[in-house]
């Protein structure tokens, strides 16, 4: 990862020259590196998970042992391999490799085969290795296992993909899914916290604690806490299989090492040797252990093993000491490999906890990005895979027991191979996780949530698609909290999280996006050589004694491992040396290492120490190191101890150490597309970040190869004349999202109030903002027949008058055919009976058949049973459709105004859009005014202006720059012109501000939302009109609407709408007893009777002359019946 190479070649300014280049549209030899970087964190984390990580995960799975017929059986997974996606054996095909486009088209999953080598042993003696198929697992597109890996753009196009296909997602049942990056606590770092709810965990507990999120190299995670008790002792708590356990700290320390009590005592009081309270507290913790009769390490291990083995499910022949070792390996500081390292880490956490409880140390903010990292897709994939491999071993034991109960089972390879096939299939758990985003786990995987882990990477437009891979979510549980602390924008997130790219609704502050320059570390590095380097620089090893007292030294931690101590006077020099090695790539120091020196201040502040981090999943970003003149990757924690300048005039010698690569590095990719965003009010930039993702544009170029449920397309897109340099850096002209429009700021009609806008009808007729919606429908005849029956195929019956000239001979509509409501849609035949069936087009919206794809099954042996019909629905702008500029100025099309009635300039120019001037004062979108002037000058001079934020200032005014350009072209300096009324032809008195603004058409269209009906379906229970636009239901009429009609004095209209036209019914009621349920119709008279008239009788009063009819809502009758079922009587007073 070269920290600065990406940003050394930023375009100096935008240009339109590539649009007129003869090679425009011809695929490049290589893909655009900038776009590929956006998904690199997703792809590389998955690459690590399926190669190095998978091997480490298999090694970390302990052998599964159980007893069978007085013998000890053990199964060990030696190796696991995931294969690239291929077709099954025996498939009829030309090529064995499966490509993503095929899975999208057939609505199947892009997956690879998982096989494992299982070693089985009897009484510790290996008997053989069995290679077993465990199921299919999803494969990330463009990863090392994907068949598209390293293909050039031309080859990608040949495989029906985008030339700039970025990957980073999974295809589950034909739908593109992205694993959402979640905020997690910083791994292997003790975080001091104060939580009042911890007092409820038991008697004597306080609100003070130190928490650590322990993560191994294969990403297995466990959360562990130290609690401070009122009596000065410490309690260790951890989670095993979603169950919370507590253990006095003294037992854990004694069990980890064979040190004497005095040595443990000395380690815990380091730096506070004269603190009598700490000495007494430590003595009390060790005394608790002695009171249980545990004076040696072996006795403590035996005691803990006896207490915990019932929850650990270890084999019966394990001694208690081994059970306790299993507990420490799986639950206590699992990121550390030796018990000695765990001992020193627990001692450090204890010292920090006492400092917190005594007010000598501040609490760490868990909501600050300093103490956070992100959950990458590869991390979740590997953790889930490891747990399912362990579950597969357990399922083999269950299958073994079931088999043994029915028949006698002998231990041999053939029997085991048959039993292995009875184990759980890993295909369904993975598909469920990716399809629903819900996690089914026995351990919880150390995560804070079990839902919302995956989202659909919908391609509404290309900007929305990009944002899925840069999104970072705080977590689903935090959305339910009433506190706002988790949503706050803290200064520590500068340069890592975009301050404006967050939703303005419920998820505000929870769903954030990485800045354009921010990167996620995805690589593991081995740090075995770093401790020796630290010792050479002056660090005292952990088992040595420093020259000064411990209170004058900093602890040194490397990735959560206590390395040693360093003199506080030497620490700054060591940190500078490490930073020098890091920037110059010397001494095998990785460039993404984080060097954090938290100094002693003499006041309650962060716990001091020298902390070094090389672990993955951290956020880093490049800045310019002024001393060395090179780019350096800095992390979230080390940034707060640096002095980073933004502009050259902010650099002070001896104080400033770093400088930003460019001023707009604090913005996300999407926010960088907003022109002159530094001139807008911040909420407007937030709105544009959201509306930019709702724009009709060009989400992709392979419309013919896609089978998405819905795709949008703008028919007449244009390249913006005014745009930031980042727009060209990401080649966004390949996926345009709007149109350059002539906008006049004038209140010309009464139809432009409340953000409404007038559009020139002639511009609309010429194609302004015309668009289409592509809708695809899968038709599978196998769903229409019984299982095992294969007699239905597409086709028509010759001479069938129902489909004459409407359907082709294959029973499908013609390509390009126009479909209206009631037209034949498709036809199929029953080969056994010869019967034909015709299905009709049911949508009220006219469409054109764009393309039809015939789909088969996985083995290529499917008959003509499944097709995908893609229809193109024209969606030209209509009154009520939503538009927006790139500055959060949204509005709806209120009127298509005839061109002859529109105002016009002296040169005869008629604006495309009339914008109400009242939209500017309160919104303060000065950037839109500047864009209007810049767009006007760009059109006049044939230029493309740079709208990158922060390039203008008070000294270098944008108004002066663009005003002079307009003046040079012969126009007014301030961008105004004299307009003439299109109605009277007279010159308007006021100067009208007119220019070119890039406008976006949003996906919110009246055609998708309008709902009206006269008669239709009714609910079977309440007899009221059903709701829902898709079923032609009625509109919702709520209490506020009712109050509005009452306030207008239209009560009769209210009675007609909500009663007569809803669920009016005539019911019989007994006037005497007031019952609505007791009147019943008499039994039918016998056939020989001369009386044929049947009357209503009250079953309570036994009278028929007291029955009357009333008009009541049908739902009221249902309500009375429900109350009667609860033994509640309703009595009516009939007047």
UniProtKB/Swiss-Prot annotation:
Positions of region (Loop B): 194-208
ZnF (C4-type) intervals: 1070-1101
Keyword Magnesium: yes
Binding-site residues, Mg(2+): 755
Protein's UniProt keywords contain Ion transport: no
InterPro entries: DNA-dir_RNA_pol_su2, DNA-dir_RNAP_su2_dom, DNA-dir_RNAP_su2_hyb_sf, RNA_pol_bsu_CS, RNA_pol_bsu_protrusion, RNA_pol_Rpb2_2, RNA_pol_Rpb2_2_sf, RNA_pol_Rpb2_3
Residues given in the record as DNA template strand binding sites: 1036
Catalytic reaction equation(s): RNA(n) + a ribonucleoside 5'-triphosphate = RNA(n+1) + diphosphate
GO CC field: chromosome; cytosol; fibrillar center; mitochondrion; nucleoplasm; RNA polymerase I complex
Binding site for DNA nontemplate strand: 1020
Cofactor(s) this protein requires: Mg(2+)
Cofactor comment text: Two Mg(2+) ions are coordinated by both the catalytic residues and the nucleic acid substrate to enhance substrate recognition and catalytic efficiency.
Site (Active site gating): 687
Major subcellular location class: nucleus
Residues engaged in binding Zn(2+): 1070, 1073, 1098, 1101
Disease: Treacher Collins syndrome 4: A form of Treacher Collins syndrome, a disorder of craniofacial development. Treacher Collins syndrome is characterized by a combination of bilateral downward slanting of the palpebral fissures, colobomas of the lower eyelids with a paucity of eyelashes medial to the defect, hypoplasia of the facial bones, cleft palate, malformation of the external ears, atresia of the external auditory canals, and bilateral conductive hearing loss. TCS4 inheritance pattern is autosomal dominant.
Record note on quaternary structure: Component of the RNA polymerase I (Pol I) complex consisting of 13 subunits: a ten-subunit catalytic core composed of POLR1A/RPA1, POLR1B/RPA2, POLR1C/RPAC1, POLR1D/RPAC2, POLR1H/RPA12, POLR2E/RPABC1, POLR2F/RPABC2, POLR2H/RPABC3, POLR2K/RPABC4 and POLR2L/RPABC5; a mobile stalk subunit POLR1F/RPA43 protruding from the core and additional subunits homologous to general transcription factors POLR1E/RPA49 and POLR1G/RPA34. Part of Pol I pre-initiation complex (PIC), in which Pol I core assembles with RRN3 and promoter-bound UTBF and SL1/TIF-IB complex.
Record family assignment: Belongs to the RNA polymerase beta chain family.
UniProt-recorded name of the protein: DNA-directed RNA polymerase I subunit RPA2
Origin organism lineage: Eukaryota, Metazoa, Chordata, Craniata, Vertebrata
Gene: POLR1B
């Amino acid at each position: 990862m070269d920290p600065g190479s990406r940003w050394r070649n930023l375009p100096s300014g935008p240009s339109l020259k590539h649009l007129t280049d003869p090679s425009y549209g011809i695929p490049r030899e290589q893909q655009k590196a900038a776009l590929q970087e956006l998904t690199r964190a997703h792809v590389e984390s998955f690459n690590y998970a399926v190669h190095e990580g998978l091997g480490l995960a298999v090694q970390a799975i302990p052998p599964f042992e159980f007893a069978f017929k007085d013998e000890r059986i053990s199964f060990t997974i030696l190796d696991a391999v995931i294969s690239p996606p291929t077709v099954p054996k025996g498939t009829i095909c030309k090529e064995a490799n499966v490509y993503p486009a095929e899975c999208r088209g057939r609505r199947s999953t892009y997956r690879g085969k998982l096989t494992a080598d299982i070693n089985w042993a009897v009484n510790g003696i290996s008997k053989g290795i069995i290679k077993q198929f465990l199921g299919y697992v999803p494969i990330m597109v463009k990863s090392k296992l994907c068949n598209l890996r390293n293909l050039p753009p031309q080859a990608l196009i040949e495989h029906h993909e985008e030339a700039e296909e970025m990957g980073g997602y999974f295809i589950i049942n034909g739908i593109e899914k992205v694993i959402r990056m979640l905020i997690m606590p910083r791994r292997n770092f003790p975080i001091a916290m104060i939580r009042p709810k911890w007092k409820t965990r038991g008697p004597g507990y306080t609100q003070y604690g130190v928490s650590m999120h322990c993560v191994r190299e294969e990403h297995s995670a466990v959360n562990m806490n130290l609690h401070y008790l009122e009596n000065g002792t410490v309690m260790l708590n951890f989670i095993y299989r979603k169950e919370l356990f507590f253990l006095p700290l003294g037992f854990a320390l004694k069990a980890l090492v064979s040190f004497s009590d005095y040595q443990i005592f000395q380690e815990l009081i380091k730096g506070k040797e004269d603190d009598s309270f700490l000495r007494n507290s430590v003595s009390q913790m060790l005394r608790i252990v002695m009171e249980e009769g545990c004076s040696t390490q072996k006795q403590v291990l035996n005691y803990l093993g006896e207490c915990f083995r019932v929850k650990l499910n270890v084999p019966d022949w394990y001694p208690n000491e081994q059970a306790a070792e299993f507990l420490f390996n799986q639950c206590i500081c699992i990121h550390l490999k030796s018990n000695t390292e765990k001992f020193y880490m627990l001692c450090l956490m204890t010292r920090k906890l006492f400092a917190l409880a005594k007010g000598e140390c501040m609490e760490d903010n868990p909501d600050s990005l300093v103490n956070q990292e992100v959950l990458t897709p590869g991390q979740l994939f590997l953790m889930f895979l490891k747990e399912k491999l362990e579950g597969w071993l357990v399922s083999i034991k269950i299958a073994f027991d079931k088999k043994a109960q029915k028949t006698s089972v002998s231990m041999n390879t053939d029997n085991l191979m048959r039993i292995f096939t009875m184990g759980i299939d890993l295909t369904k758990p993975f598909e469920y996780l990716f399809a629903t985003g819900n996690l089914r786990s026995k351990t919880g995987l150390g995560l804070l949530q079990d839902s919302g882990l995956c989202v659909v990477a919908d391609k509404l437009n290309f900007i929305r698609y990009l944002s899925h891979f840069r999104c970072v979510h705080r977590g689903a549980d935090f959305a339910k909290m009433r506190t706002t602390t988790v949503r706050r924008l803290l200064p520590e997130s500068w340069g890592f999280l975009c301050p404006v790219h967050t939703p303005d609704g419920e998820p505000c502050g929870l769903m954030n996006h990485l800045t354009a320059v921010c990167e996620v570390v995805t690589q593991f590095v081995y740090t075995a050589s770093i401790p020796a380097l630290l010792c050479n620089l002056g660090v005292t090893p952990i088992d040595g004694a420093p020259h000064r007292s411990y209170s004058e030294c900093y602890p040194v931690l490397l990735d959560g491992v206590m390395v040693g101590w360093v003199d506080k006077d030497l620490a700054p020099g060591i940190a500078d040396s490490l930073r020098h090695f890091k920037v110059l790539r010397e001494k095998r120091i990785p460039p993404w290492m984080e060097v954090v020196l938290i100094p002693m201040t003499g006041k309650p502040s962060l716990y001091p120490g020298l902390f070094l981090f090389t672990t993955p999943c951290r956020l880093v970003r490049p800045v310019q190191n002024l001393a060395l003149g090179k780019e350096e990757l800095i992390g979230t924690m080390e940034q707060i101890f640096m002095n980073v300048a933004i502009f050259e005039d902010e650099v002070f010698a001896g104080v400033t150490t770093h400088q930003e690569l460019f001023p707009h590095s604090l913005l996300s990719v999407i926010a960088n597309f907003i022109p002159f965003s530094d001139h807008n009010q911040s909420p407007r930039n937030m709105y544009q970040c959201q509306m930019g993702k709702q724009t009709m544009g060009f989400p992709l170029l392979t419309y013919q190869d896609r089978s998405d449920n819905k795709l949008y397309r703008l028919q007449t897109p244009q390249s913006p004349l005014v745009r930031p340099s980042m727009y060209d850096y990401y080649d966004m002209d390949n996926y345009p999202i709007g149109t350059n429009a002539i906008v006049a700021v004038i209140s010309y009609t009464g139809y432009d109030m409340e953000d409404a806008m007038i559009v020139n009808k002639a511009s609309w007729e010429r194609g302004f903002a015309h668009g289409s919606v592509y809708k695809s429908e899968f038709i599978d005849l196998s769903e229409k027949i019984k299982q095992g029956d294969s007699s239905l195929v597409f086709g028509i019956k010759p001479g069938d008058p129902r489909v004459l000239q409407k359907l082709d001979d294959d029973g499908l509509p013609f390509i390009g055919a126009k479909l209206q409501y009631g037209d034949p849609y498709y036809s199929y035949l029953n080969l056994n009976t010869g019967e034909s069936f015709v299905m009709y087009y049911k949508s009220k919206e006219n469409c054109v058949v764009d393309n039809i794809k015939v789909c088969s099954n996985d083995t290529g042996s499917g008959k003509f049973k499944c097709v995908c019909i893609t229809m193109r629905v024209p969606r030209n702008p209509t009154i009520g459709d939503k538009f927006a500029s790139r500055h959060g100025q949204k509005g709806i099309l209120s009127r298509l105004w005839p061109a002859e009635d529109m105002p016009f300039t002296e040169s005869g120019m008629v604006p495309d859009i009339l914008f109400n001037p009242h939209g500017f004062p309160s919104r303060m979108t000065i950037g839109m005014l500047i864009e209007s002037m810049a767009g006007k000058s760009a059109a006049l001079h044939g230029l493309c202006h740079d709208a990158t934020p922060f390039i203008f200032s008070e000294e270098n005014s944008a108004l002066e720059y663009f005003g002079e350009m307009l003046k040079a072209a012969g126009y007014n300096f301030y961008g105004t012109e004299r307009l003439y009324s299109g109605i009277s032809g007279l010159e308007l008195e006021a100067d009208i501000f007119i220019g070119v603004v890039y406008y976006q058409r949003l996906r919110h269209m009246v055609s998708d939302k309008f709902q009206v009906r006269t008669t239709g379906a009714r609910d079977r229970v309440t007899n009221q009109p059903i709701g829902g636009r898709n079923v032609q239901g009625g509109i919702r009429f709520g209490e506020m609407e009712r109050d509005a009609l009452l306030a207008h004095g239209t009560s009769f209209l209210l009675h007609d709408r909500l009663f007569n036209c809803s669920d009016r019914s005539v019911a019989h009621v007994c006037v005497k007893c007031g019952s609505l349920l007791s009147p019943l119709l008499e039994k039918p008279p016998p056939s020989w009777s001369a009386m044929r008239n049947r009357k209503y009788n009250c079953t309570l009063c036994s009278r028929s002359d007291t029955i009357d009819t009333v008009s009541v809502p049908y739902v009221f009758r249902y309500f009375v019946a429900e109350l009667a079922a609860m033994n509640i009587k309703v009595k009516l007073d009939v007047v």
